[in-house]
Design a protein with these regions (language model features):
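C-terminal helix-rich "cap/oligomerization" subdomain common to oxidoreductases
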Residues: 6, 72-77, 283-322
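Beta-loop-alpha module in the N-terminal Rossmann-like domain of NAD(P)-dependent dehydrogenases
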Residues: 41, 52-114
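Hydrophobic residues in well-ordered beta-strands that form the structural core
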Residues: 98, 123-125, 240
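A contiguous active-site-proximal alpha/beta segment in oxidoreductase catalytic domains
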Residues: 103-160
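Mid-domain beta-loop-alpha active-site segment that forms a flexible
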Residues: 126-133, 155-187, 200, 299-300
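C-terminal glycine/acidic-rich active-site capping loop/insertion
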Residues: 128, 230-298, 319-322
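Contiguous beta-strand/loop segments that form the cofactor/metal-binding neighborhood of enzyme cores
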Residues: 168-247, 277-291
C-alpha cells in the first residue's frame, strides 16, 4: 500500500485534506495507508488518528519522518511556514502536496520554485479550483462548443480585511482563470480604496496568450461569501457558482436556451463539491504510477507572480494617493 502522512492538523487540514484522504481510503481498500498525523499540539494529531484512521500521532515532523516509511506527505502549514516545510520535504526527496500560497513574498515563491526545479522531487500544490467538478464540467462544455472569448471570476467575501488577501486567497480565482484561459500575457489592476471600505477591493483586466480576454473582481468585505465563474463565447455562456458559497450550481446556455443545469445538494460532502477529493485522487494516482502530479510549483508560480505584482501595485497606488 501507499503510505501517506499528514503534517498539520488544523481546521483547513481537517476539511480539505484529512476528510478526502479518509474517504479515498474507505472507497479504495488496500490502496493507501494513513500512517501518521503530525501537529505541534499532539492532541490534535491524536484526534485525527481517532477520527480519520491515521495510525500514529506525532508532535514533531522530524521525529515522524525519521520513524515512518512515507511514500507521500500532505503538508498543511500556516502561511509563514509553507515554504520552509515544503523545501524540507523536497530536499528529502519525499513526494508531497502542500498548500498555497507559495510563500509570503515573491522572493519566497521564487525560492520555492528554484528548489523544486533543482530537486526534481514529485510534488503538488493544493489549488482545489482546478479540480472543482462544476468548474471542470463548465470548461469541458464550453471548449467543446467553440473558443472561449471571455472569462470572468468574481470572489466575494465577508469581513476579510487582511492586506494579504490578493495573494493569499484571491490567487485561487486568478489561478482558476489561468487554468481555463491559458497563460496571461498582460493585466491591468484597478484598486478600489474608498473611505467607506475597510480594505482594498480589486478589478483586474486580463489578456491571455490565445487572445481570450478576462476579468477578475475581488471584493473581500462585501457582506457575504460567494465565488462565481463565467465562460463566454459566440452563442454560449457557462456560469458556475462555486468557491465557499452556500449554493453550488452550474448553468450552461447555447443559442438562447438553457442546455445544462445542475445544483449540488447541501447534504453532499464538502470535499466532493469543492475539488478536495479529486485532488487526493490526482495525488494518489501520481504516487501509484510514479509520474509527477499536477499542478506543480512551476504551474502555479505564474499565478503567484501576478498576485504579488498586483499587491505591490496596490501599495504604490495607496501611497501615491495618501
Amino acid at each position: 500500500m501507499i503510505r501517506i502522512a499528514l503534517l498539520g492538523c488544523g481546521e483547513h487540514s481537517r476539511i480539505s485534506h484529512a476528510t478526502p484522504l479518509a474517504r479515498y481510503a474507505a472507497l479504495n481498500p488496500g490502496v493507501i495507508e494513513l500512517v501518521a498525523a503530525c501537529d505541534l499540539e499532539l492532541t490534535r494529531a491524536q484526534e485525527f488518528c481517532n477520527q480519520f484512521g491515521f495510525a500514529r500521532a506525532y508532535s514533531d515532523a522530524e521525529s515522524m519522518l525519521s520513524k515512518e516509511q512515507v511514500d507521500g506527505c500532505v503538508c498543511v502549514m500556516p502561511m509563514n511556514s509553507i515554504v520552509s516545510m515544503a523545501i524540507m520535504l523536497l530536499e528529502r526527496k519525499i513526494p508531497c502536496a502542500f498548500e498555497k500560497p507559495l510563500g509570503i513574498s515573491s522572493a519566497e515563491a521564487e525560492k520555492l520554485g528554484l528548489v523544486a526545479r533543482e530537486t526534481q522531487t514529485a510534488h503538488m500544490v493544493s489549488v482545489n479550483r482546478r479540480f472543482m467538478p462544476f468548474l471542470t464540467e463548465a470548461k469541458s462544455w464550453a471548449t467543446a462548443i467553440g473558443p472561449i472569448q471571455y472569462i470572468r471570476a468574481t470572489q466575494v467575501r465577508h469581513g476579510r480585511n487582511e492586506r494579504d488577501f490578493i495573494w493569499s486567497t484571491a490567487i485561487h480565482a486568478l489561478d482558476a482563470l489561468r487554468h481555463i484561459g491559458g497563460e496571461i500575457i498582460s493585466f491591468d489592476a484597478d484598486v478600489y480604496r474608498q473611505a467607506e471600505l475597510s480594505t482594498l477591493w480589486y478589478g483586474v483586466s486580463i489578456r491571455f496568450e490565445n487572445g481570450t480576454r478576462g476579468r477578475l473582481e475581488v471584493m473581500p468585505t462585501a457582506g457575504m461569501v460567494e465565488e462565481s465563474y463565467e465562460l463566454l463565447g459566440e452563442g454560449f455562456r457557462a456560469q458556475v457558482l462555486a468557491g465557499s458559497g452556500p449554493q453550488r450550481s452550474l448553468r450552461c446556455w447555447q443559442n438562447g436556451e438553457l442546455k445544462l443545469e445542475k445544483t449540488s445538494s447541501e447534504t453532499e460532502a464538502e470535499d466532493l463539491r469543492n475539488g478536495a477529493y479529486e485532488e487526493v485522487v490526482e495525488f494518489v494516482r501520481a504516487l501509484k504510477t510514479g509520474t509527477p502530479p499536477r499542478p506543480s510549483v512551476e504551474d502555479i508560480l505564474p499565478s503567484a507572480r501576478i498576485c504579488f505584482a498586483i499587491s505591490e501595485s496596490a501599495t504604490r497606488q495607496v501611497e501615491a494617493s495618501a
